[in-house]
Amino acid sequence: MNYPKELAYPIQESSKAFPLEGFVPGQGPLDPQIMIVGEAPGRTEVENFIPFSGQAGKELIKSLALAGLTREDVYITSAVRSRPYHTKERINKRTGAHEIVHPNRTPTKKEVMLHAPLLDYEIEQIDPPIIVTVGNIGLQRLLGNKIVIKNYHGQLIQSPIQQSDSEGSGYHWTNKPYQIVPMYHPAAIFYNRTLAETIEKDWRGLTKFLMPSTTHDKPGSSARKQ
């Protein structure tokens, strides 16, 4: 998506004060069957500017197929548009030399807040029939910090969502309810193989929410605003 310069430029400039690199816009059709909201780009994504194009992206494509979807059917974005990293020193196991590396990390609440207007803009422009959050960061960006994936994964939630306020210092709730289906992050399977069956079941179950009657008026479980 092409963002208005007056929206994106200040965020990109402010991001320089944080350990963030690159900038990966959301990508996909403007009339998608679902919008996917992830956490943040990784190293691969900031190199090729394609969201979910690394190892987690391969798992996401497999999951989409379980719901009868392809990448071309969905709009993909994230709570933070730049790669969060931290700096650490380690010994190279092959050479024995000390080296400085910059692995991925989870974005902070301040970083999510900084990038919040971009996601607000995308949701406003696309008005997705269903928002699928993958992982806790995207879920909590929309529904508050007290809601966790383990309690809601695979369920249809109908609720207002958080939008950034005009000062960029906090959130307010939309008047309009949206339909959100939380899913485990595709990378979760790399760290906990026992989630494989649950992830498959949740994505197969997504198909029942993709019918035309679910665009914005189908009741789902509700999550209280936090």
Residue positions per predicted region:
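A polyanion-binding, active-site-adjacent surface
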Residues: 1-217
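Short, flexible loop/turn segments with low-complexity composition
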Residues: 214-226
